[in-house]
Amino acid sequence: MSGLPLISRRRLLTAMALSPLLWQMNTAHAAAIDPNRIVALEWLPVELLLALGIVPYGVADTINYRLWVSEPPLPDSVIDVGLRTEPNLELLTEMKPSFMVWSAGYGPSPEMLARIAPGRGFNFSDGKQPLAMARKSLTEMADLLNLQSAAETHLAQYEDFIRSMKPRFVKRGARPLLLTTLIDPRHMLVFGPNSLFQEILDEYGIPNAWQGETNFWGSTAVSIDRLAAYKDVDVLCFDHDNSKDMDALMATPLWQAMPFVRAGRFQRVPAVWFYGATLSAMHFVRVLDNAIGGKA
């Protein structure tokens, strides 16, 4: 990331949900937690709450949530509590949440947050299988809130949905798929074998075109010219209200010369949160189906 321009680094850091630590805090029990007053300081626990049928009382950085995540949508009633890295502690104190949830290792220290309300961090990944960790985190949150049946129902629906969509991709063959999102007109984020999407690709027999380096979260930033090496691939690029940058890139001779562009195998698709959990994975499958489902 150090090689990116400052504006690119800022844009990428805005998108990333860093959660490398395993430290967790659990100082409240379900009986003491009002489910109508739970604040989520990061977008992973937002998704976990929504999967359990709980609308957060407050969420950090709702504007960027709607750009980068979009699904599941946030109701207008949700209060924006500031940045994910620096939430508004004064506002949080005034809101008197019954509980706060965040991504472990991201944002203010748990000790600082404990002065406002009890809370706990949840993990996005173990660096290898994000969806397996997502299911584990969902179960942990359900245990905390005494919503085990809701978690079981959601996970069963998730498995049924993933399985039901598999026939949509059986005719596709072995052409690899490159998953990307634009950071700026010169750099893209690409997603590798330890990303949220890999388990879905494996289930559907779709090879991941990116087998290069990745970070803990399953992604890496690359210069646009590195994509010229990819020839017989499909390429999907997740939008996030970045049409100006996309238009600038697509007007360049370098981009127009890309083999997958000339072959008509590049598509811009709706935003999917690549550091999410099961709801993001289901949204990804719907986006994937609209783009390449039922096609050879």
Swiss-Prot record:
Record-level GO BP terms: ferric-hydroxamate import into cell; iron ion import across plasma membrane
One GO cellular component term noted in the UniProt record for this chain: outer membrane-bounded periplasmic space
Cystine connections: none
Predominant cellular place of this UniProt entry's protein: periplasm
UniProt-annotated site: Interaction with FhuB, residues: 86, 88, 90, 187, 223, 226
Signal sequence coordinates: 1-30
Modification note: Exported by the Tat system. The position of the signal peptide cleavage has been experimentally proven. Can also be exported by the Sec system.
Residues reported in the UniProt entry to bind Fe(III)-coprogen: 68, 84, 103, 106, 124, 217, 273-275
Subcellular location(s) of the protein: Periplasm
Keywords: Ion transport, Iron, Iron transport, Periplasm, Signal, Transport
Domain Fe/B12 periplasmic-binding: 37-296
Record's keyword annotation contains rRNA-binding: no
Function noted in UniProt: Part of the ABC transporter complex FhuCDB involved in iron(3+)-hydroxamate import. Binds the iron(3+)-hydroxamate complex and transfers it to the membrane-bound permease. Required for the transport of all iron(3+)-hydroxamate siderophores such as ferrichrome, gallichrome, desferrioxamine, coprogen, aerobactin, shizokinen, rhodotorulic acid and the antibiotic albomycin.
Subunit composition and interactions: The complex is composed of two ATP-binding proteins (FhuC), a transmembrane protein (FhuB) and a solute-binding protein (FhuD). FhuD interacts with FhuB. Substrate-loaded FhuD binds FhuB more strongly than FhuD alone.
NCBIfam families per the UniProt record, alphabetical: PRK10576.1
Family the entry assigns: Belongs to the bacterial solute-binding protein 8 family.
Name of this protein: Iron(3+)-hydroxamate-binding protein FhuD
Gene source species: Escherichia coli (strain K12)
The encoding gene: fhuD
